[in-house]
Structure formats: structure tokens, C-alpha cells
Amino acid sequence: MSNPSAPPPYEDHNPLYPGSPPPGGYGQPSVLPGGYPAYPAYPQPGYGHPAGYPQPVPPVHPMPMNYGHDYNEEERAGSDSFRPGEWDDRKVRHSFIQKVYCIISVQLLITVAIIAIFTFVEPVGKYVRNNVAVYYVSYAVFLVTYLTLACCQGPRRRFPWDIILLTIFTLALGFVTGTISSMYENKAVIIAMIITAVVSISVTIFCFQTKVDFTSCTGLFCVLGIVLMVTGIVTSIVLIFKYIYWLHMVYAALGAICFTLFLAYDTQLVLGNRKHTISPEDYITGALQIYTDIVYIFTFVLQLVGSRD
């Protein structure tokens, strides 16, 4: 278009929509026409964002969650987004753990008090040693309440029967343990208490930290329980006729090891995030199992380190 008065050529019939770009493409204008504010050109591949404008906010990715090793990829993909229910479940589990260990603390305080009275108060210790009926009646009450709480869902979930049965169970097992402790020297009882406390705390810390899932080995623990029960029956029959020291010590060591493993298993059932867990409604069951494990560890350790009066 060299002559302004001449009509535009055929190629310029629509000057707003040019037909074909010139060879080499269009270059970006260095300066926009006067009168209009400068506006940054669109970013080209390989070029950064124009200076003076904030960069766009990057997409927000969900925070990675800490999954257990049992989660598969499909479950992980379906759980990547934040769900408010996860925090609720976590709060429920934490509240459940606190409730279980508060109950266990009260049970252990009652048991330690009974053991101290039976051991350090000589008239009481002498009375329970001379009256074995106290031991057998307490043991019968212990078995009945234990089986009721462990096997019957109704009583252990119904207030106030759960508290009443658990209190009777704790007192009965405390009387049994106190009677056994009264037959040993005071020093042996104190040493057994210290060892039991160290073992119980160590197992609990280990269960909080480890990735080993003891709850996936239910069959193994059933076998251990059967072996311990059969060994106890055979040992009791043999010791009735003749006391064999090494046989007694082997049985006590086996019992201490087995109930330490049972404590780890039951602790992981309470902590959750494993293959098998206890329902938050069964806090009585959790306290019952862990408390029983600790008491049995104490009795077996007492047999190992103690000497009878």
C-alpha cells in the first residue's frame, strides 16, 4: 500500500485478519502505541514471567499423611485428600488410650497397696499365710470376673456393671498377688516390683516406636499360651510330689517371657493403627488385659528373684 489514495490490494481485503503471516512469524512489538498503558506480553516458552507482576499462586497439594505399612496404593490414593473425620478418629483413639491407662494406673495403685499391706504388715501376712482359703476364694472370684468381662460384651459395656465388675476383679487379683508376695522376703518383692515396672515401661515405649506388628501374629500367641498352660499343669503335678528347683525356674522364666510378649500384643491392640485393634468402646477390655499381663509378669519375676521366708 504505497499509494494512500489507491484501493487496497486483494491481499489486504480484510486488514484486521491478515491471511498469512510473513516468513519468520510476527515479532513482538518493542513499544506499544502511545496513549495506552504498557501491558506485558504473554510469556513464551523458555521465558520467565514479566517483571513487576506477581507470579500466579501455585496449586496447593494435599499434605502427605503418615500411613502405616499395611495401607496399599488404592487406599492411599483414596485417602490423600483431607478428611475431617480423620482428626475425629484420632481424637477418639487418643481419648481411648488415656482412659485405658488411667484405669490401669488406679488398678496398679490398688494392687501395690494390697501387696504392701500383705508383705510389710506382719499380722496380715501371717494371717493370709495360715488361711489358704483367702487365696483360693480370691482366685475363684478373679477367674469368674475375668471370664465375665472378657467373654460377655453386655456387662463390660454397661454402666455401672463395668466399673463394679472391674473393681471386684482388681481386688480379687490384688488379694491373690498379695498372698503370693507374703510368702517371699520383702527385699525380693521390692526387686520384683522394680523389674516389672522397668519391663512394662520399656515394652510400652517399644510398642509406640516399633513398626513390628505383633497383632498380626495372633496364631503364634495362641500357641505360646497353650504351651505355657500345659507346662504349668505338668510342673504343678511334678512339684506336688517332689520339688525340683530348676524345673520351677524354667517355668517361671518361660512365664515371664510369654507374658512380656502378651503385654506387647495387648498394648498394640490398645494403641491401634495395626492389623487388629480394640474398639474404643471396649476400654474395660484393654485395661483388663494389660493389667493382667503386668501382674503375671510380677508374679513370675518374683519366683525368679525371690526366696521364700
From Swiss-Prot:
GO terms for molecular function: death receptor binding. It comes from Mus musculus. Keywords: Endosome, Lysosome, Membrane, Phosphoprotein, Transmembrane, Transmembrane helix. Signal peptide: none annotated. Negatively regulates aortic matrix metalloproteinase-9 (MMP9) production and may play a protective role in vascular remodeling. This is Protein lifeguard 3. The keyword Membrane applies. It comes from the Eukaryota. The gene is Tmbim1. GO terms for biological process: negative regulation of catalytic activity; negative regulation of extrinsic apoptotic signaling pathway via death domain receptors; negative regulation of Fas signaling pathway; negative regulation of protein localization to plasma membrane; positive regulation of blood vessel remodeling; regulation of calcium-mediated signaling. The lineage of its organism: Eukaryota, Metazoa, Chordata, Craniata, Vertebrata.
